[in-house]
């Protein structure tokens, strides 16, 4: 398994030497500046690749191994008028990446919003901050700030009472911050920052699309791109929904083991794989992560390793330290290592410590939400320690011992 680091480019303020010092050898990056639906050119890719892989004397090399992501446009997700054009541009971008030996591509198929949190700086018991999703605050936003048409039917009477109480206790600053947290694009998002009216309008474009319809559109997309990916040796890794349930009445189709089984059955191409994100899938108590990892091990080409802690009835959660929370990280790494040992050298599983707590000096710095340097470095070191121990001892790990 190879250790990777998500790097948002030179403007993000994280020097590549910091990546080396964290212990990573591989880079996960993307051309975020290219508009959605527009082809990535070889020249653009080479420029970014050279920036990453030009190694100063005495430094260990870094390799741009994974793209996260080539955004999938809303027209593709809705099978809209521009879908054919956008799929063509997506394929052309994939071909350009393959020509430059970048052959793992992460993407998602979540409509409108990629990942959603109500709090980007929830204070933990250590004083570090983490991202958090509060179900009642989310409902307050949906019902009383966004005022989505038909939202009431998605919430119980108890939910609606709690949401109103929260909304009525909020001042204007808190309301504005909640809007920023939920309605603005976050790292990895395929959307632009949205105003409330624009957000409502975008949601309305999915009004006639249910989960079955969205899944058909995903299958149509995969049937177009996987033959080319197979011919190029490219691995496509579908990221799970985050959180793995419906938000804003929108359909979700990559939330459970059954969802992925249906996708792989519909398009069994070798290139059709998954990004095994333990944080996203782990939010649901009914997702057995070790079982999912074992069932789909041969299709896991990229992994996001992080943990979440469910609160109350499980709909509220916060991002835990990497070895804490509700994720059996040791058991999962054991399964991934077993799979990795079966593979040829060029097919190893690439993973990154996903997200991290904002701590120490990062508390005083402007950081990309979810991606502070120190918290991710801590997470990567902890994961590396587990891998080193499992490799050295060849443990038959039993989580019940």
UniProtKB/Swiss-Prot annotation:
Keyword GTP-binding assigned: no
Cofactor(s) required for function per UniProt: Fe(2+); Mn(2+)
Domain of life: Bacteria
Pfam families (alphabetical): UxuA
Enzyme Commission code: 4.2.1.8
SUPFAM superfamilies reported in the protein's UniProt record: Xylose isomerase-like
Biological process, per Gene Ontology: D-glucuronate catabolic process
InterPro entries in the record: Man_deHydtase, Xyl_isomerase-like_sf
Molecular-function GO terms, alphabetical: ferrous iron binding; manganese ion binding; mannonate dehydratase activity
Designated name of the protein: Mannonate dehydratase
Origin species: Brucella melitensis biotype 2 (strain ATCC 23457)
